[in-house]
From Swiss-Prot:
This is Holliday junction branch migration complex subunit RuvA. GO terms for molecular function: ATP binding; four-way junction DNA binding; four-way junction helicase activity. Residues 143-150 are annotated as: Flexible linker. Has three domains with a flexible linker between the domains II and III and assumes an 'L' shape. Domain III is highly mobile and contacts RuvB. It comes from Acinetobacter baumannii (strain ACICU). Residues 1-63 are annotated as: Domain I. Keywords: Cytoplasm, DNA damage, DNA recombination, DNA repair, DNA-binding. One of its GO terms (cellular component) is cytoplasm. Residues 64-142 are annotated as: Domain II.
């Protein structure tokens, strides 16, 4: 099992990070809360979870051990796979997710792409007790550092990131169009678009 990887960020394409670890490039899918903290050339430690399926192996990476623990906890819920768990962590930061579960806020959870009412209710029931211990000491991911994107425009990067979370192309375009005039960086556009879609 690969518990964490320490290396240099070689490339970024939301939500995937290519991490150079001693000459070996690892493709790691990350929640946007982690992705938005990374810059090309930066040396980082990513806490990882490896998912092995019959047809593929996929690494998921997180900026801290707590986010990894929550990802693994989400995977234990019936009907929640890695893509949905990543979408939940990308849409709601750790603090907001714990608050949402504690307060039975189904309406917030159903705004996550792919999470319907039944899944949201199941998440509430199965995670309530597990998240009580996480309620203390969670930190908000609201103030994330800027990110440098290599290839596309900030608008295109933001739209691609939202689509990778499961939003339809038209939804992503509308959300980005509504906020793009106020921001120049992709990470800021992504955060603002997600916030507007959660209203």
């Amino acid at each position: 099992m690969i518990g964490c990887l320490i290396g240099e960020v070689f490339a970024l394409e939301a939500p995937t990070v290519l991490l150079n670890v001693n000459g070996v490039g690892y493709e790691i899918d990350t929640p946007l809360s982690t992705f938005c903290q990374l810059q090309k050339g930066q040396k980082v430690t990513l806490w990882t979870h490896l998912v092995v399926r019959e047809d593929a192996q996929q690494l998921y990476g997180f900026s801290d051990a707590q986010e990894k623990t929550i990802f693994r906890t989400l995977l234990k819920v019936n009907g929640v796979g890695p893509k949905m768990a990543l979408g939940i962590l990308s849409t709601l930061n750790v603090e907001l997710l714990v608050h949402t579960i504690e307060h039975d806020d189904v309406n917030t959870l159903v705004k996550v792409p792919g999470v319907g009412k039944k899944t949201a209710e199941r998440l509430m029931i199965e995670l309530r007790d597990r998240f009580k211990t996480l309620a203390q000491g969670t930190s908000s991911a609201a103030a994330l550092p800027q990110i440098q994107f290599v290839s596309n425009s900030p608008v295109a990067e933001a739209e691609a990131a939202l689509q990778s979370l499961g939003y339809k192309p038209l939804e992503a375009q509308k959300a980005v169009a509504a906020v793009k005039a106020d921001y120049t960086e992709s990470a800021d556009i992504i955060r603002a678009a997600l916030k507007s879609m959660m209203k």
